């Protein structure tokens, strides 16, 4: 027997070594490690132990009986059979447990089948010890019955003790040490009642025995929702029928028969399904407004300035505050040139005196700001608070000028100016930035109408002014409040000059979170402040978007708002177009970090974020910023202006790269942008335009910092285009005035690159400031060449008067702007006397050349026989030599008559033949005296002479004589 045990000693050790890790894990999971030593296993009395030969014959497999109809108990029976059927090997040595093998095992498939309906997946809390269930170990129980009893008698997960003596393997836990030094481990589980982030594992519902429900909501809940909708529909139909019956009754019968409604919905009957929460929780009083207090007070003060005209109440005198006034006077005395803030300017405008018609100086108030901040609600509440009946119109609907005029006059003049309850009207024009310029001009015309007091002060006739006012309309005596989203719309430029401009700032997050929490509590929706803050950040503090998002989530059946629900919900986002300065601000400035950055490599270069594909964890925040800037620039729309602003401002930032590699990378991105635009517009490849918004996103990654950038509006491109157009105009003017001989050799490109730079030196000779009669022959020749050069290039000096009253001579056209850079030092200019002398000589030379040209043109006519001022003919009529012109005293009428030659043209017929008329011989009785030939010749000569006299009735200066410039020089 001893020999037999010695032979089996090694085999038992091999068996123990082979299954040591599995036995250790099973002992730990079944809770039997505390009752038995590590090397032994307890066998129930109902089943005899197997012999060693049976164990060897069975090998590693263990018989696993499984009853029919219960396939889910295969794994559980496996563990039971291992524990019950395998014999306990007797080993004199206790083996060391292999913990590293335990860590590598995956028990999730086995443990997920033991989950309870209320336990989350992955819960592997050890079950109670087998000692709690002694009846299961009796011999009369089979394996299937034992499994059924075990499932029936296991305690619920909520009743299990969460305090463990050993750390769990597949659950999160925290360790706690008592005062006595004992350490315990607490299992972390989700809180199903308290607020917080909702665990998606808790939404898994169980159905039957261990089967998951395929629906996200239990069938019972769905049935309740359907029943509630049907009940609500019946209530709506009943209410609609009741309203129809009441509308058919007369007013007297309705007053008599009026009683309680037939059926009223319960107080918690989802009234939000009939109306929007935005309308339900809209502020009704001044104290309920969420907008800025200063803006609210300014608008209310401006409305109170109309009290004298509208209500007939005098403006209350403001009580002086001695401390504040003395301090303000002292500040103004010490710093008279200090710029006033926007608040101070608004206060002074509101404290200013009224106009002669007892109206405020600004006849209209303009509220501007992003959508969703409550501008329209602010106008309604403040107007009602001031005692007005609000009349609202949308400028985007009534776009025609006539409709715009009709609506405005109907609200202020044509109809009764008293609204509901005898209150005067206050006109609120919403979305006025969508109105065309013609409609804005109509509004300006109504605002600029003057009263009789203003007409008397202006000195105009009262009767004519009154007739004109009756034709155009009466004086505006009601306040008008305009609302816009973009104050920089071109159509609002003239209106802003006459309006009280009030910019509505974003709502404070604390106020908005408090209001949202009140709305959630009133509707029974649980929400923690963190989720509400995340909602405000997602919607940019848009009141309307926040409330609509809450109502949407509430309508979808969600009764608890969590941060995850806010982040995964795409409702509440709006396609808001930001201004250019807002886009540039977000590109060049990092957002505020509300928590410490984890996993961000601060030593990583900026351009590596665009080019590398390294660790995704370190680029999480950078990628989020990248996509945010990409979305902002895409919604901006004005890509060319955005890129031009980036180009003008990125070199003014604080660069962190001493090697300027980021600057080179930015220039490469700008070149890439130019190539994309060129390919898109020239090659009609418009699909490439989708890559343009990546340029601002790349600039954000390269140059964004926590410092506030000083951004200026881009003007370099506009200045360059203006200078280019001016240069082209100067060159075109210069070329058009050149002489043909000079123009043939001077092209615009040659003038700009070669000629004009040297021409400026030629036009600035050294001339003495004396009379030209004192010049030497060389100086006269130099002056003559200068005048000839300037005339050849169509250059001259023109006298201009400066704003301070001085006179200057400037070169016209100013070619100095074309070829001289502003940074270069200017050449020594000519004196005022030298420029004046050159300008006089240029004008004299122009007159000489014009006279010579006219004389040259009249030369051929003189040769042909026309009488000119310098043409003399011999008495015989033949062309002779040209003689000097006679003197004035020799030019008499008789001499002109002798020189004049009368040539009569013969009469011709239609075909050009000379007509010969027969002269009838008159009788001696009727023969008239013949006209004197000398008198006839004198009349013809006077008509062709250089001096003639013509009588014009009522005019005495009828003597004319041709006078040439050469006669005066």
Swiss-Prot record:
InterPro entries (UniProt xref): AAA+_ATPase, ATPase_AAA_core, CTF18-RFC_complex, P-loop_NTPase, RFC_lid
CDD domains listed in its UniProt record: AAA, HLD_clamp_RFC
UniProt keyword list: ATP-binding, Cell cycle, DNA replication, DNA-binding, Nucleotide-binding, Nucleus, Phosphoprotein
Coiled coil ranges: none
Biased composition, class Low complexity, residue ranges: 257-268
Binding site for ATP: 369-376
Phosphoserine modifications at: 221
One Gene Ontology biological process: chromosome segregation
Phosphothreonine, modified sites: 51
Location(s), subcellular: Nucleus
GO molecular function list: ATP binding; ATP hydrolysis activity; DNA binding
Function field: Chromosome cohesion factor involved in sister chromatid cohesion and fidelity of chromosome transmission. Component of one of the cell nuclear antigen loader complexes, CTF18-replication factor C (CTF18-RFC), which consists of CTF18, CTF8, DCC1, RFC2, RFC3, RFC4 and RFC5. The CTF18-RFC complex binds to single-stranded and primed DNAs and has weak ATPase activity that is stimulated by the presence of primed DNA, replication protein A (RPA) and by proliferating cell nuclear antigen (PCNA). The CTF18-RFC complex catalyzes the ATP-dependent loading of PCNA onto primed and gapped DNA.
Subunit structure: Component of the CTF18-RFC complex, which consists of CTF18, CTF8, DCC1, RFC2, RFC3, RFC4 and RFC5. During assembly of the CTF18-RFC complex, CTF18 may first assemble into a subcomplex with RFC2, RFC3, RFC4 and RFC5. CTF18 then interacts directly with CTF8, which in turn interacts with DCC1. The CTF18-RFC complex associates with PCNA and with DNA polymerase POLH. The CTF18-RFC complex does not interact with the Rad9/Rad1/Hus1 complex. CTF18 interacts with SMC1A and RAD21. Interacts with DDX11.
Name this protein carries in UniProt: Chromosome transmission fidelity protein 18 homolog
Source organism of this protein record: Mus musculus
Originating gene: Chtf18
């Amino acid at each position: 027997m001893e020999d037999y045990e010695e032979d089996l000693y090694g085999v038992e050790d091999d068996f123990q070594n082979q299954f040591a890790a599995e036995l250790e894990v099973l002992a730990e999971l079944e809770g039997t490690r505390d009752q038995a030593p590590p090397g032994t296993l307890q066998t129930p009395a109902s089943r005899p132990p197997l012999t060693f030969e049976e164990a060897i014959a069975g090998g590693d497999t263990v018989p696993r009986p499984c009853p029919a109809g219960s396939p889910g108990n295969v794994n559980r029976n496996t563990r039971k059979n291992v524990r019950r059927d395998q014999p306990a090997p007797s080993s004199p040595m206790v083996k060391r447990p292999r913990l590293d093998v335990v860590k590598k095992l995956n028990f999730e498939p086995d443990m997920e089948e033991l989950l309870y309906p209320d336990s989350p997946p992955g819960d592997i809390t050890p079950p109670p010890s087998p000692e709690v269930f002694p009846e299961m170990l009796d011999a009369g129980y089979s394996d299937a019955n034992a499994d059924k009893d075990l499932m029936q008698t296991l305690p619920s997960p909520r009743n299990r003790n969460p305090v463990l003596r050993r750390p769990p393997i597949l659950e999160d836990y925290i360790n706690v040490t008592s005062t006595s030094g004992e350490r315990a481990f607490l299992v972390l589980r989700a809180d199903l009642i308290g607020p917080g982030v909702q665990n998606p594992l808790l939404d898994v519902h169980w159905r039957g025995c261990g089967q998951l429900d395929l629906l996200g909501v239990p069938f019972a809940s769905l049935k309740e929702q359907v029943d509630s909708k049907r009940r609500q529909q019946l209530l709506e139909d009943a209410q609609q029928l009741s309203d129809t019956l009441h509308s058919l009754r007369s007013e007297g019968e309705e007053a008599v028969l009026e009683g309680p409604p037939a059926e009223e919905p319960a107080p918690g009957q989802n009234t939000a399904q009939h109306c929007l929460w935005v309308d339900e929780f809209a502020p009704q009083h001044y104290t309920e407004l969420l907008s800025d207090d200063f803006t609210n007070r300014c608008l209310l003060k401006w409305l109170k300035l109309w009290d004298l005209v509208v209500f007939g109440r005098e403006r209350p005198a403001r009580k002086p505050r001695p401390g504040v006034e003395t301090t303000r006077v002292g500040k103004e005395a010490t710093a008279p040139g200090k710029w006033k803030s926007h608040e101070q300017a608004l206060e002074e405008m509101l404290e200013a005196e009224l106009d002669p018609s007892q109206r405020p100086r600004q006849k209209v108030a303009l509220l501007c700001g992003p959508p969703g901040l409550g501008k329209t609600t602010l106008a309604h509440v403040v107007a009602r608070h001031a005692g007005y009946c609000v009349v609202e119109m949308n400028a985007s609907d009534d776009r025609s000028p006539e409709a715009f005029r009709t609506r405005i006059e109907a609200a202020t003049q044509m109809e009764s100016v008293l609204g509901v309850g005898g209150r005067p009207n206050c006109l609120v024009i919403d979305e006025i930035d969508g109105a065309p310029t013609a409609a804005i001009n109509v509004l300006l015309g109504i605002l600029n109408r003057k009263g009789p007091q203003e007409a008397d002060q202006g000195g105009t006739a009262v009767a004519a002014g009154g007739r004109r006012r009756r034709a155009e309309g009466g004086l505006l005596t009601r306040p008008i409040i305009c609302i816009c989203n973009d104050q920089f719309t071109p159509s609002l430029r003239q209106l802003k000059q006459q309006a009280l401009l009030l910019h509505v700032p974003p709502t404070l997050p604390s106020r908005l979170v408090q209001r949202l929490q009140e709305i959630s509590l009133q509707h029974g929706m649980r929400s923690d402040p963190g989720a509400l803050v995340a909602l405000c950040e997602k919607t940019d503090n848009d009141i309307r978007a926040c409330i609509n998002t809450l109502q949407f989530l509430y309508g979808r059946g969600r009764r608890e708002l969590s941060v995850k629900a806010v982040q995964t919900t795409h409702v509440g986002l709006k396609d808001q177009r930001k201004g250019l300065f807002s886009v540039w601000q977000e590109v060049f400035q990092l957002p505020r970090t509300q928590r410490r950055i984890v996993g961000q490599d601060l030593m990583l270069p900026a351009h590596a974020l665009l080019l590398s594909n390294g660790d995704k964890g370190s680029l999480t925040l950078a990628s989020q910023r990248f996509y945010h800037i990409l979305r902002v620039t895409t919604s901006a729309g004005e890509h060319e202006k955005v890129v031009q602003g980036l180009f003008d401002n990125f070199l003014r930032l604080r660069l962190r790269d001493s090697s300027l590699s980021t600057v080179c990378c930015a220039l490469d991105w700008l070149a890439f942008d130019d190539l994309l635009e060129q390919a898109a517009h020239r090659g009609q490849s418009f699909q490439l335009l989708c890559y343009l918004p990546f340029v601002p996103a790349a600039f954000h990654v390269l140059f964004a910092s926590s410092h506030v950038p000083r951004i200026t509006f881009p003007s370099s491109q506009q200045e360059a285009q203006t200078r280019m157009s001016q240069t082209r105009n100067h060159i075109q003017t210069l070329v058009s005035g050149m002489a043909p001989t000079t123009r043939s050799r001077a092209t615009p490109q040659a003038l700009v690159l070669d000629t004009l730079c040297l021409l400026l030196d030629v036009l600035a000779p050294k001339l003495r400031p004396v009379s030209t009669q004192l010049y030497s022959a060389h100086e006269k020749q130099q002056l003559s060449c200068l005048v000839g050069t300037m005339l050849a290039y169509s250059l001259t000096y023109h006298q201009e008067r400066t704003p301070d009253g001085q006179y200057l001579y400037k070169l016209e056209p100013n070619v100095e702007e074309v070829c001289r850079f502003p940074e270069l030092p200017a050449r020594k200019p000519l004196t005022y006397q030298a420029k004046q002398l050159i300008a006089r000589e240029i004008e004299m030379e122009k007159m000489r050349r014009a006279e010579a040209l006219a004389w040259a043109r009249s030369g051929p006519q003189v040769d042909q026989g026309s009488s000119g001022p310098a043409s003399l003919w011999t008495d015989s009529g033949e062309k002779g030599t040209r003689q000097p012109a006679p003197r004035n005293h020799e030019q008499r009428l008789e001499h002109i008559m002798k020189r004049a030659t009368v040539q009569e043209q013969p009469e011709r017929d239609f075909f050009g033949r000379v007509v010969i008329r027969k002269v009838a011989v008159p009788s001696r009785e009727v023969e008239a005296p013949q006209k004197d030939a000398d008198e006839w010749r004198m009349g013809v000569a006077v008509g062709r002479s250089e001096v003639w006299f013509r009588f014009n009735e009522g005019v005495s200066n009828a003597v004319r004589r041709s006078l040439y410039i050469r006669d005066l020089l």
